[in-house]
Amino acid sequence: LVVRQQSDAQGQLGLGSGWLTQHAALNSQIALRIRTNESFHLINDNRPVICIGNGTGLAGLMSLLHARTRQDYTQNWLIFGERQREHDFFYQSTIEAWQTTGMLQRLDLAFSRDQEEKVYVHHKLREQAQQLKAWVDHGAVIYVCGSINGMASDVDQALIDILSEAAVDQLRQEGRYRRDVY
């Protein structure tokens, strides 16, 4: 579980992140319910997957990647963005181990605050446009998980610019473009 405390412009904490960071005792049990996103389930075959996300969205992508590694499916590409590598590279040892063992064929990281000019996941998509096209041509399924504000729309636009609007619409219709954004 990855939790980052969120607040609105007035400083009001987010309902879930505020409760978890301010009221839930560390290592205590809490009652919760899991709400399934029916459109974000993992495919049941060995087609390549491209996982794109930022922040706490990595948790959703990690569940997909864990399932694929258990089945020895290695055509996995993770494009992940956060603020600072030193503080925000969640699951770093697991991700690096997957890369070393070949379970993660590609890894592109975008740490927006580690350099003067901010770099986000949509920039990484654009940098890797030819690879993206090749993976999609080989049947890749694209999963996007994370911020609805900013990241999700920027990724949408990058995909449209790289692949075309018609191609992205076709991916959606075929169930090859799946999102869990919040």
Where are these regions (language model features)?
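Active-site beta-strand/loop microenvironment that shapes enzyme catalytic pockets
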Residues: 45-68
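Reductase modules of NAD(P)H-dependent flavoproteins
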Residues: 1-40, 69, 73-182
